[in-house]
Amino acid sequence: NNTARMMLSLAVARLMSEHGNTLFINFETFYGFKGILKDEENENLSDALYAFRQNHNQFHKNIVNAISHYERLDYIPDASCAEDIDDIKPEEIGTFIQAIGRELGYSNIVIDIGDGIRMPWNMMDCCDEIYICETGNYIENMRFKNFEKYLLEQGLDNIAATFKKIQVNEDENINNDDIWGRL
């Protein structure tokens, strides 16, 4: 469920930001960040991906313009164009994330992989921890089991072994303005 995943990823980012320099990036299309973090950003993930595509070696100098701040958390706002996420090659995403961490000195980078990433296991292979939502929803649980089975069949046991399942209870009143305060 996208809402549960969003709530979990933001909660993890918020907790990590209390213990170190943390950047949050989401690859979900039409995420709705503006309504959650209420920050006026100038650039976004589309701009960051464009800078990366133009110059893999020096993009970190331009990406700082796409990073916004909310309390102690740094984040890159939603892509303004869904195709920008879809167009990036799966193997480039890991390079993109690792270069940001290395060049900009983030202790933690929290990624909401979302549905926009093709072959997400390429990015997952770069992650130290992968949090998976458990909502009690039968269909969502079956989707995850099928995904886990696929990883095992493909010999990607190392990725499946890093999954940490977290119970997420969705609040019925998710549309209120204080989502950040309730994470």
Which stretches of residues belong to each language-model region?
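General structural signal for secondary-structure boundaries
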Residues: 41-44, 56-60, 88-92, 157, ...
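Walker A (P-loop) phosphate-binding motif
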Residues: 1-25
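Conserved catalytic-core segment of NTP-binding enzymes
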Residues: 95-182
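Charged, low-complexity, helix/coiled-coil-prone segments
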Residues: 2-8, 33-48, 85-95
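Short acidic, S/G/P-rich loop/turn micro-motifs used as interaction or catalytic elements
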Residues: 2-4, 31, 80-89, 116-119, ...
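Cytosolic-facing regulatory segments adjacent to core modules
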Residues: 55-69, 75-115, 141
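Phosphate-binding loop that captures ATP/GTP phosphates
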Residues: 18-75
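Short secondary-structure transition/capping segments
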Residues: 22-24, 69-78, 152-166
